[in-house]
Amino acid sequence: MTIRAVVRGVGHYLPARVVENAEFEGKLDTTDEWIRSRTGIERRHFAAEGETTSQLAIKAAAAALADAGLSAADIDAIVVATSTPDFTFPSVATMVQAGLGNTNAFAFDVQAVCAGFVFALANANGMILSGQAKRVLVIGAETFSRIMDWADRGTCVLFGDGAGAVILEAAEGAGTAADRGILASDLHSDGRYRELLYVDGGVSTNGQSGHLRMQGNAVFKHAVQKLAETAHAALAKAGLTPEDVSWIVPHQANLRIITATAERMGVPMERVVVTVADHGNTSAASIPLALSTARARGQIKAGDLIVTEAIGGGLAWGSVVLRW
């Protein structure tokens, strides 16, 4: 008998405020056409004044619990991937725990920026395989609007706010690639590249955060190469190839990176989940948001083989292969 961490439920939450590209015209030297042609982004959601990362995460978690037909008390562990926590501490995960009314789980945050959800999934998988937890609530949640430099057209038009959640549950498998659940993961970091993507100040409880800084062209080159490599590596660990993939669910950084990575992997865009036009780059929230959205659209179905891949500041990058 082999234990697998299978997806029991998914959910997401997006703030009510929708910001179209046109809102940036007049404020910045940019246009809707410029943003669309370079990023594929048409709109994004921004949190309201006072709306926090933990609040978005709680709503996404509640949706995932409802989808799974579970109560908060059924969860043994909560892992939140975020780089925009409400406070330096306590963790967003413990705030989610309190918000859901759970008192029996252990809860902690994972910080790998845009790669955070992939790292969190891999951690949750390990906890289930080791027997530490039977059900793990894994959340990606961000309020990147708090750390934007609104004078920098190269970054502030890219990002959005939101949250997505996945509930993993221990289940018996046959130990083959036909099993449901997480089949393999592949994680990497290289701190030599910290200057390519970072925030020039820390989280603070008075709301005065630093601003995101990015060398976009350099990040693009690293992203396409490293994302394709890590996806291939995870598939190889599972004894699978790109031809076996039903869906790539990538980090929704921008359409150019998504398209170039799929091309490098030899996977047609018809088998790639794309939500970046409506959400922008929501960092650690983008993959669970895309999973939940794709399931709601009827794209992802039971038995589908899915590859998630992401890269973020650090640099940190990785992928997870799972069967729905």
From Swiss-Prot:
Entry annotated with the keyword Electron transport: no
Keywords of the record: Acyltransferase, Cytoplasm, Fatty acid biosynthesis, Fatty acid metabolism, Lipid biosynthesis, Lipid metabolism, Multifunctional enzyme, Transferase
Residues at the catalytic site: 114, 251, 281
Pathway involvement of the protein, from the record: Lipid metabolism; fatty acid biosynthesis
GO biological process: fatty acid biosynthetic process; secondary metabolite biosynthetic process
Pfam families: ACP_syn_III, ACP_syn_III_C
Principal location listed in the UniProt entry: cytoplasm
Gene Ontology molecular function, alphabetical: 3-oxoacyl-[acyl-carrier-protein] synthase activity; beta-ketoacyl-acyl-carrier-protein synthase III activity
Subcellular location: Cytoplasm
Domain commentary: The last Arg residue of the ACP-binding site is essential for the weak association between ACP/AcpP and FabH.
PANTHER family referenced in this protein's UniProt entry, alphabetically: 3-OXOACYL-[ACYL-CARRIER-PROTEIN] SYNTHASE 3, BETA-KETOACYL-[ACYL-CARRIER-PROTEIN] SYNTHASE III
Quaternary structure note: Homodimer.
Function: Catalyzes the condensation reaction of fatty acid synthesis by the addition to an acyl acceptor of two carbons from malonyl-ACP. Catalyzes the first condensation reaction which initiates fatty acid synthesis and may therefore play a role in governing the total rate of fatty acid production. Possesses both acetoacetyl-ACP synthase and acetyl transacylase activities. Its substrate specificity determines the biosynthesis of branched-chain and/or straight-chain of fatty acids.
Family: Belongs to the thiolase-like superfamily. FabH family.
Protein's recorded name: Beta-ketoacyl-[acyl-carrier-protein] synthase III
Natural source organism: Rhodobacter capsulatus
Lineage, top ranks: Bacteria, Pseudomonadati, Pseudomonadota, Alphaproteobacteria, Rhodobacterales
